[in-house]
């Protein structure tokens, strides 16, 4: 080395010399060799070592850095995204006697843009004595890459005013900025400029146009640009395949992959594999995915983090978790995204414990979980028994400071909702309510509905209105369901007016919700008016009104509407048949109902559910054909559930068939030993038939096994305020007055009835 220096030879860089940068620099004696050494390091992509050599040279010598070396150092900072070093070198340039020109300034602009310091870039740009096309393009690129599309567009217009003609690089940057701003009109103008200035043959501009049209959801335009490129490159194919995959044209994405492979010119990269595998996931076609997996192996990309991650996600979404795990284990250097995919795959397929186990492996492997990791893990905690595990995850979230992430807080809310802990839901929501978004509000409103707290839901909605968060169609759906829960037609009408005022009423989802609300609140006329006003009625619209008619006792109207639905060419679904079977039951059309039940599968391909079976049991039982109802249950292909047996039990009570009621109750208690309804109905039947001994035995059994009747609840609306009452409520603020009035009414009833009825009333009162 010393001989080379004495001879004034150019400095060449080897790996061994890189390991000892300081010692190498300390042996350099001339300014020329110092500059050559730094340039050589930069050229060999040893950016950190080049910057260290610069620091060492400045501290230990008075060598003058040349213009070309400054350019190399600035490029090193750009490539390594080292903003601090870039500023340091820029300051050194300003304080030196270096006569720097537009080329150096352009490199400085590019460095600041790539490092994300747009303020510095703009300051340099504004003070440049001379600016050329590269200067403008560098700053426009910086704005575009950092999500400031509007600023990029303003600067581009200023560039045109200075009579600078954009080249393909300028077009590439400004088209990307236009795509991020979602300005379709400007995008079309830029496309016209590309054609006018004959840049349409340049790949950079053309590929940018494809990406822009994909961003605008205009795949036909993207496809026209793609097929107008005479010599496509890998980016062209990658952009069009990604576009089709992202926008739901999965078969087209796979078709373009096949077309690309047929030319035999390009080998897919990890990004093309990722887009193609996403298409397979959306189609739920693991057979296609496994073929692409074979291509990945052939291309030696199966161990690549991006391709491996996509493979893992595809197998997990298609339910092949063992394959997903094998692919994950083959990834050479898994990153956080790879871990997140396998955790999400397990969680979304219901393997909560396995997801937690992989999460623990992730942490023990030295990876720090991010918000996606935690959200995926929380998705697995969907049952009350998972509450303890969910709380542990909550403690991790607090420990790692993720409570500031709103998406994580929303996932926590959802977890507590599924795990039936409304108290924790409320406490958590109050902690971040001031920062809540529409997802947060909708989640807490849904939680209230799921836990039968419609009045609390309405209170929270009023708070939402005074917040900065605007209700959306999901909010309206929750409100309408809440109105149904408390049977408040007045409140439902107010929600209807609010949806009209906010412009949400025209949405199909809202209209269907309004039909349901009006029907269940007893205003079938208004429900029908909304139905008739709809331009595009879907199966939900028809089914909702049919069910509404049926449940309100208008069976004939429901069946007429069902015929109209079939005439309109709308294929019924399982909900439709619940409605028509209920209608047949209410109007006593037993044979018609049995015929419809038979045609469900033969004509419409709908497999009967337990709900349909329950409707048939009700149909037969209401007609007094209890033995047929019993035989139907015994011959069911599905295992009868509590609802089916309860339907029979209720019918037995109406028909006074104690023997069959006993069988129904026993089957209910086999499934749910603590079911209070079975005990109470059977007890009531024994009392009604004068069998006081068996009634008393049942009552004693309930007390022994701590079986408690679910307290009834009712609402009353007085002066726009909803009052809620529970049976045996000890917390109501006016409970003493309420119970005094009830006691007086009860005493009056006992005084005015005959002795036989008096005994029955006393027993009912004692059994609750």
Swiss-Prot record:
Localisation: Mitochondrion
Annotated segments matching region Type E motif: 644-719
Organism encoding this protein: Arabidopsis thaliana (Mouse-ear cress)
Keyword vocabulary terms for this entry: Mitochondrion, Repeat, Transit peptide
InterPro entries associated with the record: E_motif, Pentatricopeptide_rpt, PPR_At4g14850-like_plant, TPR-like_helical_dom_sf
Coiled coil ranges: none
Domain of life: Eukaryota
Transit peptide range per the UniProt entry: 1-70
Repeat positions for PPR: 30-60, 66-100, 101-131, 132-166, 167-201, 202-232, 233-267, 269-303, 304-334, 335-369, 370-404, 405-435, 437-471, 472-506, 507-537, 538-572, 573-608, 609-639
Alphabetized NCBIfam families for the sequence: PPR
Encoding gene (name): PCMP-E86
GO biological process: RNA modification
A GO term from the CC aspect: mitochondrion
One example GO MF annotation: RNA binding
Name this polypeptide is given: Pentatricopeptide repeat-containing protein At3g53360, mitochondrial
Homology family: Belongs to the PPR family. PCMP-E subfamily.
UniProt-annotated stretches for the region Type E(+) motif: 720-750
Main location: mitochondrion
